[in-house]
UniProtKB/Swiss-Prot annotation:
Binding site for Ca(2+): D10, D138, L139
Biological classification of the source: Archaea, Methanobacteriati, Methanobacteriota, Methanomada group, Methanococci
GO molecular function: calcium ion binding
Protein's UniProt name: Protein archease
Keyword terms: Calcium, Metal-binding, tRNA processing
Length: 139
């Protein structure tokens, strides 16, 4: 599940999951639903990548910006993600498989361009019923 919250010139995303991995997955869905209707994205292509972060905030920032890199460079949009997060001596490592397809302007109904994810007001916290993340994107 994901929701949006308003900020002054940007857009905030709030995502929840029963696990940290599920919250990151929902956060990525929220990112792509800003850009396109993710229900219209088919799983024709997949990409796999691995990123690290010294803390969870850096991990989330690196994860979402890595996805944006694939959108900017490869013209891909995604609607599903397999996410695995491991804690290690240097912080955290995330492995992701993202599923989607090339952008098709007629099919995907382009809504907004997301320029970047920011650290501004980023939150990641464990709650009684799971995890919640919040982040803001520059449009």
């Amino acid at each position: 599940m994901f929701n949006y919250f308003e900020t002054t010139a940007d857009l905030g995303v709030e995502a929840k999951g029963k696990s940290l991995e599920e919250a990151f997955k929902e956060g990525a869905k929220g990112l792509y639903n800003i850009m396109v209707d993710i229900d219209k994205v088919d799983k024709k292509e997949k990409i796999e990548f691995e990123i690290t972060g010294e803390d969870l905030e850096e991990l989330l920032y690196n994860f979402l910006n890595e996805l944006l890199f694939y959108t900017d460079v490869e013209n891909l949009v995604f609607n599903d993600f397999d996410v695995k997060i491991e804690k290690n001596d240097n912080g955290y490592r995330l492995k992701c498989t993202a599923y989607g397809e090339k952008i098709n302007k007629e099919k995907h109904n382009i809504k907004e361009e997301v320029k970047a994810v920011t650290y501004h007001k980023m939150e990641i916290k464990q709650e009684e019923d799971g995890w919640k993340i919040r982040y803001i994107v520059d449009l």
